[in-house]
């Protein structure tokens, strides 16, 4: 059965279709991380990066070196930058942009729109689908109306949404996102309480989501849930 583990901030580990997937893997500089980077030595299959702010690109480059069989999934512009900057062969990347599903070794992957900023490419969200489960990781984003289309097109079971405010949606705005995305199982808050600037009460998110007829699940750093 697929499992999801929140690693603090926006970092998520997904075990799905016999693959270990790391999304926005900031581990070393993550004050909430329950794990050390060396726990992901030679056991990661896919690294997903929504954009290249340091708290999302994180340790992706080092993880590629630690996992010679792993691939990295991001926008093509970001992949080209990483290839040139860190001398990584382009064969390690899965070329993509916002659009439809891409098949990757039994998984289906897609990138979605996100409303944010980024260093070397447009920001994105990510869709990972396998074993009849679809997970939407919104990356960093503000609220935008096309979230309705993300729900309609990809029909996620789980929506991982930033709620820390200031740089992304706050709990109330994220609850409006849930109402548009309509996750079939749970909305899971991310990107909050890592630092004082994004300190919020996740229970506010849970209450607002419940008012709209959906369920939210707050994980502690290191906590896993079966999907």
Swiss-Prot record:
SMART domains: Lactamase_B. GO terms for molecular function: hydrolase activity. The keyword Hydrolase applies. Keywords: Hydrolase. It comes from the Archaea. PANTHER family: UPF0173 METAL-DEPENDENT HYDROLASE MJ1163, UPF0173 METAL-DEPENDENT HYDROLASE MJ1163-RELATED. Belongs to the UPF0173 family. This is UPF0173 metal-dependent hydrolase Saci_1512.
């Amino acid at each position: 059965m697929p499992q999801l583990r929140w690693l603090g901030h926006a970092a998520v580990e997904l075990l799905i279709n016999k693959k270990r997937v790391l999304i926005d893997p900031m581990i070393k500089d993550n004050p909430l991380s329950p794990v050390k980077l060396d726990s992901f030595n030679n056991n990661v299959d896919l690294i997903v990066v929504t954009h290249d702010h340091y708290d999302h690109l994180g340790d992706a480059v080092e993880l590629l070196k630690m996992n010679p069989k792993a691939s990295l999934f991001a926008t093509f512009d970001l992949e080209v930058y990483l290839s040139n900057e860190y001398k990584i062969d382009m064969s390690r990347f899965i070329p993509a942009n916002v659009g439809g599903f891409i098949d990757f070794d039994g998984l289906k992957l897609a990138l979605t729109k996100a409303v944010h900023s980024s260093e070397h490419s447009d920001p994105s969200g990510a869709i990972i689908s396998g074993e009849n489960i679809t997970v939407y990781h919104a990356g960093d984003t503000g609220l935008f109306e096309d979230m309705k289309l993300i729900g309609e097109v990809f029909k996620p079971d789980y929506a991982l949404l930033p709620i820390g405010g200031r740089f992304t949606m706050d709990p109330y705005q994220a609850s409006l996102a849930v109402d548009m995305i309509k996750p079939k199982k749970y909305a899971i808050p991310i990107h909050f309480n890592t630092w004082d600037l994004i300190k919020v009460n996740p229970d506010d998110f849970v209450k607002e989501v419940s008012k709209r007829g959906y369920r939210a699940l707050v994980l502690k750093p290191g906590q896993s849930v079966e999907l």
